[in-house]
Every structure is written in C-alpha cells, then in structure tokens.
Amino acid sequence: DIGNINSVAHSYLRFERPRSFFAPMSFGNCGYAFPTIIGAKVARPDRPAVSYAGDGAWAMSMVETMTCVRHGIPVTAVVFHNRQWGAEKKNQVDFYNRRFVAGELDSPSFAGIARSMGAEGIVVDRLEDVGPSLKKAIDMQMNEGKTCIIEIMCTRELGDPFRRDALSKPVRFLDKYRDYV
C-alpha cells in the first residue's frame, strides 16, 4: 500500500518472477494493496497473493475480506498495526514542530474483525513469529483455500518519511508550469 510500508517493501523485497510486485508508488491512493491482490489472485489463482498495509490504509479496504470469504478468493494480508498514520505523523515532526493533527488511530483488533467475517486472523507480537505466521497464512491460502489476515503489532517509532520532498515546493521543468505553486 502507500506510505512507509510501500517504501520499505520496495526497498527490501526481492522477486524472481516478473509481475510479482504491484505498488501505487507516489500516487497516494491509500487502500490500494488489498483490492489489487484480490484481482491478482483471481487472474492467477496458482500464485500466492500477499498485501502489505499499515493500519490506516488497511481500514480503507478491510471489508473486502468478506468479499474474499464469500467468493472463495484466498489471499493473505499483512497489516502493520502501530496505531497511527506513520508517514503523515513523521512529516508533522519534521515540518510542523511536532504539532500533531489527526495522526493517531484507535483501531480494534484487525485479526478479530477478520475472524468475524469468516477469514483466519493471526496476531503477531514477537518478531520471531513473523516468518512462521506468514508461511502458515500462505499455506492456508494455497492448500486450504483460506483468506488470512496477519496483524503485526508494531512499536510507535516513526521511520524516515518515504518522500522527504513531500511538503517542499515542486521543481517545474516545463516553462508552462513554472508559475504554478
């Protein structure tokens, strides 16, 4: 999805086959990841489909879990739950002298919501459980036809923003746009 999750995934995940990673990049379309993997799974049911999203972006598309359950579309979603809009909050630290506006998220258990919709829900609160939980979820997806939501409980530390220029005046290269702010 968009935000720091996308930046980290793009920097560290490696794939052996083309068309294995879809990302919104800097378009800012929050809630992109989950619907995208649902479409990818329908197109290629023989391949695992995994999305990564922060808790803010996840809240925009999590109801599609029910769509997956109802229509037998097995996917895996990994939700990083740090109870805040991390990228936005970091920009407020860097550009607005720690004046926080609408950066906090008070969210329920996403794994619990997934279970209430008929999917599997796994809560991970220890780093050493991330790998085994992901393997279990992908196994359920590929061998049992189940959708699984992995909720990773994260610290509230703020990472570097994925776009340091997010609040800077853009550089205009074409003359016709130079007068625009």
Protein language model annotation of sequence segments:
Residues 9-14, 35, 62-64, 87-92, ...:
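Short acidic, glycine/serine/threonine-rich loops at helix termini
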Residues 23-29, 97-105, 181:
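A short acidic, glycine-rich active-site loop
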Residues 6-7, 28-30, 58-59, 83-87, ...:
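Short gly/pro/ser/thr-enriched loop/turn and capping motifs at secondary-structure boundaries
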Residues 43-136:
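Conserved thiamine diphosphate
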Residues 1-35, 40:
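Active-site diphosphate/adenylate-binding microenvironment
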Residues 11, 136-181:
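Glycine/aspartate-rich loop-and-adjacent alpha/beta segment that forms the canonical ThDP
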